């Protein structure tokens, strides 16, 4: 068998202008995804065997991972920019259009949690979002994102969209890296580990707000809630599984691109804070102004108390947000 004409390093230089490896996917110079990368590389004539291709891919990823580019925009965005607006095929309010706009742009370190009562249309809205992303999503919950092996199944997906949250025993360090697009080690099965930036948008759907640690201010800055608490009268049970036409989806994106995104996060601030404190033990025992009283009340309610320093931090935050009335406490102490 003849020897390879080029070293892997030389091949990396040759292909650096022809292909791009971005977060688990391969693209050509026209930003078109290469679905069958092994066949694509073999057809170029630079490789003798399939094993040469495998070695080159590992070398290319390791050589250029630190310079990894951002994903090109979804083609549906460009289509939507040039289409005429028509009435929406499904009623979407301003906040829902803002969420679609943000998820498509994904230019800030935020993940959305959709919560609310059953029968309010949550599943239908999540179904629309998945289809806008051409079903290029992975149904991973927060627990699975904390695991390096299940995390690998989400690499190369543009959207993480799960109907489960599962916020127990989280690796917050890993999650912060994921949500802030920092390099993270990916451990795919039957392949070498490599570093990549997790570039997916995140959208989770649950009936009840999860218990999240308010002392982790870094994570709190990255969370926005959207509540849907109004039940739909006479709902169509097939809507959460309906397959929308491509034309309808382009029109939805066109409407989302038209929405005013000025100071858009402030529109979700109140419901986000309400959801963050709803299951918090400090809020549930907010009438107790001393730690010892708070810890005792937690035991009576079957809640796990924070440590005293963390209790003080959370309590200060709840005072700042207006969920604890310090003036009322002072008045009661004076009586």
Where are these regions (language model features)?
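N-terminal accessory nucleic-acid engagement/regulatory domains that precede
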Residues: 2-76
């Amino acid at each position: 068998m003849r020897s390879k004409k080029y070293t892997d390093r030389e091949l990396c230089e040759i292909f650096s202008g022809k292909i791009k490896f971005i977060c688990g996917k391969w693209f050509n110079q026209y930003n078109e995804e290469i679905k069958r990368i092994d066949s694509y590389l073999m057809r170029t004539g630079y490789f003798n065997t399939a094993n040469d291709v495998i070695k080159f891919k590992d070398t290319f990823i390791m050589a250029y991972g630190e310079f990894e580019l951002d994903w090109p925009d979804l083609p549906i965005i460009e289509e939507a920019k040039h289409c005429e607006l028509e009435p929406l095929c499904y009623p979407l309010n301003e906040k829902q259009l803002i969420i679609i706009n943000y998820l498509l742009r994904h230019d800030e370190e935020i993940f959305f949690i959709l919560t609310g009562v059953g029968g309010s249309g949550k599943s239908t809205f999540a179904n629309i979002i998945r289809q806008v992303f051409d079903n290029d999503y992975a149904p991973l919950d927060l627990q699975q994102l904390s695991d390096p092996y299940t995390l690998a199944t989400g690499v190369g997906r543009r959207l993480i969209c799960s109907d489960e949250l599962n916020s127990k025993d989280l690796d917050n360090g890993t999650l912060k890296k994921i949500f802030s697009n920092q390099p993270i080690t990916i451990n795919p099965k039957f392949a070498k580990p490599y570093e990549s930036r997790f570039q997916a948008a995140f959208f989770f759907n649950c009936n009840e707000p999860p218990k999240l640690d308010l002392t982790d201010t870094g994570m709190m800055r990255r969370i926005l809630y959207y509540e849907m608490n109004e039940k739909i009268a006479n709902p169509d049970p097939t809507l959460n599984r309906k397959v929308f036409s491509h034309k309808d989806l382009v029109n939805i994106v066109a409407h989302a691109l038209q929405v005013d995104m000025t100071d858009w996060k402030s529109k979700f601030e109140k419901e986000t804070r309400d959801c963050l404190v709803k299951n918090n033990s400090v809020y549930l025992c907010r009438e107790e102004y001393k730690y010892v009283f708070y810890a005792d009340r937690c035991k009576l309610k079957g809640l796990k108390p924070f440590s005293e320093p963390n209790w003080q931090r959370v309590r200060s935050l709840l005072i700042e947000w207006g969920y604890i009335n310090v003036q009322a406490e002072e008045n009661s102490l004076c009586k």
